[in-house]
UniProtKB/Swiss-Prot annotation:
Annotated EC: 3.1.3.11
Major site of localization recorded for this protein: cytoplasm
Chain's gene name: fbp
Binding site for Mg(2+) 2: D113, D116, E278
Protein name, UniProt field: Fructose-1,6-bisphosphatase class 1
Residues that hold Mg(2+) 1 according to the record: E93, D113, L115
Pathway: Carbohydrate biosynthesis; gluconeogenesis
InterPro entries in the cross-refs: FBPase_C_dom, FBPase_class-1, FBPase_N, FBPtase, Inositol_monophosphatase-like
Record organism: Syntrophus aciditrophicus (strain SB)
Subunit comment: Homotetramer.
Catalyzed reaction equations: beta-D-fructose 1,6-bisphosphate + H2O = beta-D-fructose 6-phosphate + phosphate
Length: 332
């Protein structure tokens, strides 16, 4: 009986390296990212035993309470990215400032959320590690620490996410598609599957925090009222988990602006999700899967020029017919 040899993630990347003229530097960078994800998953699985599930007792730059796993995941990713020696600068949700690494010899900027949905950790529910990668301009000298890293999503060459601890992760490569991998426990052997959003509206799902419906704008509330019965409703409460479902079933994930809250301090007219390491990441993956993403002005997410490294945005991401409909609504 012939032996079946599973494909390794490195084999997959090498095939694409040859086909799309990618360099070995990218392979080294991706190896550091997948190693970081493995370490995060290990700490997640053993968190209760090692006392890593509580609060860290600090507040991050977003004004959010930090959990111990947030700090652990951030430290892990920063360590492996620095060890790769291929990264110029890093923007992390958990780091107030830009993190300099190899400004002279590095080739990539990396944007990441080390532990999306960390409030799920204590309940054993899925969390995510999201990342986006942009390449240094070949003719570029560093303009300065405050602007060179501020790249549009259209400048990204890759983006991906790990859904921890499911053993599944997604990687989108520019002009080469969006791929989901089912990995073994070592994340060495993988089963790649190209993701394309389904065309059948009967499969589509609608995902958003329904508890906030009354504080959305009138336009958004009206659209929900008309369309909520057309699609199945699913909401996990972690961007990585909800977007993972979206890639499988199609439809729409949205995080609208909050503009009608009884307490004006709770309003978020600019949106909640961060552009560089959340919205751009899922927008990039969705585009490579045949979808699109916009903000609440109808502007494509990947065309937004960031003004700051923790800039927030509204987000509507999913199947193109729905996104086109919403873009027309917002621009009207």
């Amino acid at each position: 009986m012939p032996i079946e040899f599973e494909q390794t993630f490195r084999n997959f990347l090498m095939e694409h390296q040859e086909k799309y003229n990618r360099t070995y530097h990218f392979l080294i960078l991706m190896d550091s990212i997948i190693t970081a994800a493995q370490r995060i998953e290990l700490y997640y699985r053993t968190g209760a035993l090692k006392g890593n599930l509580g609060m860290a007792g600090s507040i991050n730059v977003q004004g959010e309470s930090v959990m111990k796993m947030d700090d652990i995941a951030n430290e892990i990713v920063l360590h492996y990215l620095a060890a790769s020696n291929r990264v110029i600068q890093v923007v992390s949700e958990e780091s107030d400032d830009i993190v300099d690494m190899n400004k002279d010899g590095g080739r990539y900027f990396v944007y990441f959320d080390p532990l999306d949905g960390s409030s799920n950790v204590a309940h054993g529910l899925p969390v995510g590690f999201l990342f986006g990668i942009a390449k240094r301009n070949l003719d570029g000298n560093m303009k300065g620490p405050e602007d060179f890293h501020l790249r549009e999503g259209n400048d990204y060459i890759a983006a991906g996410m790990f859904v921890i601890p499911t053993g599944m992760f997604t990687l989108a490569l520019r002009d080469a598609g969006c791929w989901r991998f089912h990995a073994d426990e070592t994340a060495t052997y993988v089963k790649p599957m190209r993701m394309t959003l389904p065309d059948d509206p009967k499969k589509w799902e609608l995902s958003f925090n329904s508890a906030n419906t009354t504080v959305f704008s009138e336009k958004v509330q009206s659209w929900i009222q008309v369309n909520i019965s057309k699609y199945k409703f699913r909401y996990i409460g972690a961007l990585a988990g909800d977007f993972h479902r979206l890639l499988t079933n199609g439809g729409l994930f949205m995080y609208p602006a909050i503009v009608k809250h009884p307490d004006p301090k709770e309003n978020r007219p600019q949106g909640k999700l961060r552009l560089l390491y959340e919205a751009n990441v899922v927008a990039f993956m969705c585009r490579e899967a045949g979808g699109d993403a916009i903000d609440e002005t109808g502007t494509r997410i990947m065309e937004i020029k960031p003004a700051g490294h923790h800039q927030r945005t509204t987000l509507y991401v999913g199947s193109k017919p729905i996104i086109d409909e919403l873009a027309s609504l917002f621009k009207s």
